Amino acid sequence: MNTLFIADLHLSAQEPAITAGFLRFLRQDAIHADALYILGDLFEAWIGDDDPEPLHGEIAAALKALQQAGVPCYFIHGNRDFLVGKRFARTSGMQLLPEEQVLDLYGRKILILHGDTLCTDDQAYQQFRRKVHNPLIQKLFLAMPLRWRLKIAAKMRARSQQSNQYKSDSIMDVNPQAVEQAMLRHKVHWMIHGHTHRPAVHELALSNGKAHRVVLGAWHVEGSMIKVSADAVELIQFPF
């Protein structure tokens, strides 16, 4: 018995090898799990559930097949695909979760999240995040014609890539105080997240005892997953 976690696949039509690797992962690994949790940035970009991109339908069908095989799939939005909505969730069989969720798995209480909210030193990003998560702004954006949304998304990605070139690694990583506050607030000693693309297992000393923060890697040249069982919490990097 085990539960699997993944994040930061950044699927797109331009990276067919990653898509193939993900579909293989669903068939060979996820199919044997108690559940699959996707902690954001499954897609490189998401401009609305009405986008007719064929890749989206292919991924939805594969996730639906997983659900129909008896493996539930849960999704937390990332900074790239925060507009994934109820329509895609229904089509894919995924269950949408809030940005922070506490799980009780095999005797461990684990806080799961995408991870971008922990990067509080990057004030410019946090300000941008507050804007794009405003329900009114999202409603206005989704009401635009698809071609407008495509252009806006492309400009935003280019601007983000340019901005990140001038940011230090420390600013783009999690803030230790933000991590501790989140774990104390939820009364947990385990945290799993993605976003930073820095796979590692961190041992922490909180005010209420020892804790662990496990970070998923991005799917670039290899896959990354966390396997939680009654015996262990394992970070696993694997070839496509």
Swiss-Prot record:
InterPro entries: Calcineurin-like_PHP_ApaH, LpxH-like, Metallo-depent_PP-like, UDP-diacylglucosamine_Hdrlase
Highest taxon, organism lineage: Bacteria
Keywords attached to this entry: Cell inner membrane, Cell membrane, Hydrolase, Lipid A biosynthesis, Lipid biosynthesis, Lipid metabolism, Manganese, Membrane, Metal-binding
Disulfide topology: none
Keyword Manganese: yes
Gene3D superfamilies per UniProt: 3.60.21.10
Binding positions (substrate): 79-80, 122, 160, 164, 167, 195
Binding site for Mn(2+) 1: 8, 10, 41, 197
GO cellular-component term (any): cytoplasm
Keyword hit for Methyltransferase: no
Membrane-topology descriptor: Peripheral membrane protein
Function: Hydrolyzes the pyrophosphate bond of UDP-2,3-diacylglucosamine to yield 2,3-diacylglucosamine 1-phosphate (lipid X) and UMP by catalyzing the attack of water at the alpha-P atom. Involved in the biosynthesis of lipid A, a phosphorylated glycolipid that anchors the lipopolysaccharide to the outer membrane of the cell.
HAMAP family reported in the protein's UniProt record: LpxH
Family: Belongs to the LpxH family.
PANTHER family: UDP-2,3-DIACYLGLUCOSAMINE HYDROLASE, UDP-2,3-DIACYLGLUCOSAMINE HYDROLASE-RELATED
Protein name per UniProt: UDP-2,3-diacylglucosamine hydrolase
Record organism: Serratia proteamaculans (strain 568)
Gene symbol of the encoding locus: lpxH
